[in-house]
């Protein structure tokens, strides 16, 4: 991934050096900085583990190679084991790899005038990233709430999205989708069981969300690695 491509996908690049199980160096860069995508670190001789994480969030905790975020966004990472000695190359090229699966719900019918928020509740995946494996660490419940701009009300074919870290490269998740008005009253809710997901893929659920009758088809976007289709 080029610097320009990474800046488009990520706003933050975090670097951690771990030596003997302890974080011995930490650096955060933000897109727009002249040094973005160029990490300089005086690494002493010995064995080290280097972690690189690109995202649009904030790492709230990093321990044993597992990163926790305040929210899950498009995320790329790489873990490098490096033995530093007199013969070690001073420049190490790093290619970050996308770690998330993306879920999209497309409402083909018009958004109701009283819609204020939509909420995804995802089970069967993780909101934390094990950078060594590139996968989630343990199963937990992830909730994402999206504020709906008033300018979108009445529009059709609106897309709502959430990212998650799968526990395996390919796995199934359960998704509860809930739409609410400004007072928190539920307008409509849908549950989708066994939604097939894959890291670096977009699984897309498309259908009439707010009507009395609804039907859904599920696809995955080739803008990433591929597509997954479902019909209900």
Regions found by a protein language model. Give the residues of each.
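Short coil/turn motif common to extracellular beta-sandwich-like domains
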Residues: 1, 97-102, 170-172
């Amino acid at each position: 991934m080029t610097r320009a491509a990474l800046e488009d996908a990520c706003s933050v690049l975090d670097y951690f050096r771990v030596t003997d199980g302890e974080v011995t160096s930490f650096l955060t860069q933000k897109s727009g900085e002249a040094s973005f995508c160029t990490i300089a670190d005086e690494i002493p001789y010995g064995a080290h583990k280097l972690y690189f994480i690109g995202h649009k969030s904030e790492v709230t905790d990093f321990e044993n190679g597992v990163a926790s975020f305040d929210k899950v966004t498009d995320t790329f990472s790489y873990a490098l084991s490096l033995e530093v000695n007199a013969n070690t190359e001073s420049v190490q090229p790093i290619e970050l790899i996308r770690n998330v699966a993306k879920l999209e719900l497309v409402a083909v019918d018009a958004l109701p005038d009283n819609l204020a928020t939509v909420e995804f509740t995802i089970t069967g995946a993780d909101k934390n990233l094990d950078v060594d494996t590139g996968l989630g660490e343990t199963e937990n419940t992830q909730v994402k709430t999206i504020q709906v701009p008033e300018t979108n009300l009445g529009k059709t074919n609106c897309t709502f999205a959430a990212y998650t870290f799968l526990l395996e490269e390919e796995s199934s998740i359960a998704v509860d989708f809930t739409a609410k008005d400004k007072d928190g009253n539920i307008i409509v809710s849908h549950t989708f069981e066994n939604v097939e997901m894959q890291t670096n893929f977009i699984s897309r659920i498309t259908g009439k969300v707010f009507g009395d009758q609804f039907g859904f088809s599920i696809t995955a976007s080739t803008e990433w690695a591929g597509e997954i289709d479902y019909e209900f």
